[in-house]
Amino acid sequence: SARELALSALHQLRERDAFAQDIIAKTIDKSRLSREDRAFATRLVLGVTSTRGTLEDVIDGCMDSPDDAAPAVRDALALSAYEIIFLQKSPHAAVDQGVELVKTVAPRAGGLANAVLRRVVRAKEHFPFGDPRTDIAAYARLHGFPVWLAERLIAELGPEGARDFMVASNEPAPVFVSVNAVKASEDEVVSVLAAAH
């Protein structure tokens, strides 16, 4: 599944201390999943990676003993928490799928996952834990930024510049196409791209 593939990529990122795009190219892009599932897995990996600090804070606040959870379990919880908090996934579905995902790496941790993810769903009601209009820490959490980085951005760019930077950092990158005029005309490339979409 897309979630299991994303979880595998997150595990490799943690173990190898590699770049997300390199792991995505080696695992997700070469998988036999549908194009939509590969895109979803990629979105999950990039989303969890970019919001990891915020997700870890939320998960830690929802666990009685955060240090006791194995790294693979924390990866699965982070993936599910990302879906709940940042993708606004249906809470019931996110908890059920998150429990199943955790069980793929720790079969006996289903109860823990259920309890933690239900708490994440409840915590989401108060997320980002403050008023983002007046509280920079809440604004940072809302955009998945570590608070220390938000504070540094304010020092460098001012409050408005820091807010603009955080918003822009979460926008999807634009797609550009370069046409090799020796191999195809611009019209041919446009036609091929239109047909592929």
Where are these regions (language model features)?
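Class I Rossmann-like S-adenosyl-L-methionine
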Residues: 1-197
